[in-house]
Amino acid sequence: MTSRALLLLASALLGTPGLTFSGLNPESYDLATAHLSDGEQFCQGLTQEDLQGDLLTERERQGIACWSCRKILQKLEDLVGEQPNEATINEAASRVCRNLGLLRGACKKIMRTCLRLISRDILAGKKPQEVCVDIKLCKHKAGLI
């Protein structure tokens, strides 16, 4: 009786190679009856792998933050004009975020948290890239001091 049970078990395992170690049950292994099982277990691995390709690396995330900062500060510099002073910078800062679309939220946060440093840098004649380095949204580039 015991040998018969072992033989039955062995034939079941050999009939579905890899099934024992995959964590799948026979219903999800057979595509014709896969809809009868939970199904989430089968798709979960695919979903996780597919999403991993869409996740941003730290380097990409920093690049996006730096690009956004430069765009925002370039717009601010354009609004401030040729002869910046504290009043023109504050006036421009209050208007700069209005027409930036997707960058509006980031713009508001930058203006709220960093305006004092941004003002100081603009008054010192620094360019948007340099200001973004100072507020730590960009890294130093080669040749930029």
From Swiss-Prot:
Transmembrane segments: none annotated. Keywords: Antibiotic, Antimicrobial, Disulfide bond, Secreted, Signal. Residues 62-142 form the Saposin B-type domain. GO terms for cellular component: extracellular region. SUPFAM superfamilies: Saposin (SSF47862). Residues 1-22 form the signal peptide. It comes from Equus caballus (Horse). It is found in: Secreted. May be an effector molecule of cytotoxic activity. Has antimicrobial activity. Pfam families: SapB_2 (PF03489). It comes from the Eukaryota. This is Antimicrobial peptide NK-lysin. SMART domains: SapB (SM00741). One of its GO terms (biological process) is defense response to bacterium. InterPro entries: Granulysin-like (IPR038847), SapB_2 (IPR008138), Saposin-like (IPR011001), SaposinB_dom (IPR008139). Disulfide bonds join C66-C138, C69-C132, C97-C107. Residues 23-62, 141-145 form a propeptide.
